[in-house]
A protein has these predicted regions:
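Substrate-binding/active-site clefts of carbohydrate-active enzymes
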Residues: 165, 188, 200-362
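Short proline/glycine-enriched turn/loop motifs at strand-loop junctions of beta-rich domains
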Residues: 65-70
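Structural beta-strand segments of beta-rich domains
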Residues: 57-61
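Beta-strand signatures of extracellular beta-sandwich domains
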Residues: 72-74
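The feature marks proteins involved in alpha-glucan
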Residues: 10-12, 19-55, 82, 90, ...
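Surface-exposed loop and edge beta-strand positions of immunoglobulin-like domains
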Residues: 62-64, 98-100
Length: 362
């Protein structure tokens, strides 16, 4: 990264450029030399929509935070090397910037500078990489390390931990929004004729002998011909999927060599869970999910999603700082009115989203 005449420049991701080209012209031959270094600048961009929006020749980034004093966009190359650039504008409490030559496949996250005062419900800490709540795709999972917590584990949550969490965090991924839906539409089966089949994306096909091993337990397995025939034999008109938006495996489960199997531990509401993809996590999961929906719809089968909008995977005040907590804790969560250090917990999950605010409902 370098700064020239007040403008900030950084190196674009080689993987992002390759994926964008593959989407346009098909698979590329192995490169015979390294990609040239590209220098691009950040422009003001626009505040809406939130998230990372690829616009053909670059990407607009926007994130909401009422309490932030400064927001850094963090871009990661194929080696995990991080480049930081300040989002230059703030409009309607959204920090935003447009970066030319950032393509689908680019990994990104944020660092939010602002007050760290847990006793007043403020938990900004720029040493903690925070993922975009509006990301459409993620690569990787949380690798549990003390650095992903906003406070030292040897102290209480009022103290601030300044270890960098980036090496242990998943990253958001810029996606290409284009997909050939071939005129797809919801079958709109009348309710009195609806037969719903509830299932789990992984468990339903993980051991299915008629599904290729490379597809078992994935989105594409849900629309494999053998599975489609099973739906029709049962008279199914709608498939209801247990949580498929991005979730994490809790620390205490991983310590016991277990997994968050059911998925009720959301961290990315706009992103299909990456571990259910068969071909990759740099946006491929989005296209596979869309292909599954399109195929089921073509067969007259509706798709219903089981969603988890009451809480997130960040838990209570002793949980990790992954996204919402480090971006704008009080805007996204319901805090105790008398002691905003603590979270209102209606369901025994550690926190409750503040669903009465426009921010959480957007």
């Amino acid at each position: 990264m370098e700064t020239t005449y007040g403008r900030t420049y950084f190196h674009a991701s080689a993987a992002g450029r390759e994926i964008a080209l593959q989407m346009a012209v098909g698979p590329l031959p192995p490169p015979v030399e390294q990609y040239p270094v590209l220098f691009v600048e950040i422009w003001p961009g626009h505040p809406f929509p939130l998230g990372a929006s690829f616009e053909g020749t670059g990407t607009n980034f926007s994130i909401f935070s009422d309490v932030a004093e400064r927001v850094e966009l963090c871009l990661f190359d194929d080696r995990g090397v991080e480049t930081r650039v300040d989002l230059p504008e703030q409009t309607a409490l959204c920090w935003h910037g447009y970066v030319p030559n950032v393509y689908p496949g680019q990994r990104y996250a944020y660092r939010v500078h602002g007050p760290y005062d847990p006793s007043h419900g403020l938990r900004c800490n720029p040493q903690k990489l925070v993922i975009d709540p509006y990301a459409r795709a993620f690569e990787g999972q949380v690798r549990w390390d003390p650095a992903v917590y906003g406070y030292p584990l040897s102290a209480d949550d009022l103290a601030r931990d300044d270890r960098d969490s980036a090496p242990y965090m998943p990253k958001g991924v810029v996606i290409n929004p284009w997909f050939n839906w071939n005129g797809d539409h919801n079958p709109h089966t009348p309710w009195h004729q609806t037969v719903i089949y509830e299932t789990h994306t992984k468990g339903f096909t993980k051991l299915h002998p008629a599904v290729p091993k490379s597809l078992r337990g994935t989105y594409l397995a849900l629309c494999h011909p053998a599975v489609m025939q099973h739906y029709h034999d049962l008279g199914v008109t709608a498939v209801e999927l247990m949580p498929v938006h991005q979730f994490i495996h809790d620390h205490y489960l991983v310590d016991r060599h277990l997994r968050q199997y059911w998925g009720y531990n959301s961290i990315g509401y706009f992103a299909p869970h990456n571990e259910y993809a068969s071909t990759g996590q740099l946006g491929q999961q989005v296209n596979e999910f869309k292909e599954m929906v399109r195929t089921l719809h073509l067969a007259g089968i509706e798709v219903i999603l089981d969603v988890v909008y009451n809480h997130t995977a960040e838990g209570n005040q002793l949980g990790p700082t992954l996204a919402f907590r480090g971006i704008d804790n009080g805007a996204y969560y319901r805090l105790s009115p008398d002691q905003p250090r603590y979270y209102v917990d209606y369901t025994g999950t550690g926190n409750s989203l503040s669903c009465g605010t426009r921010t959480s409902c957007s």
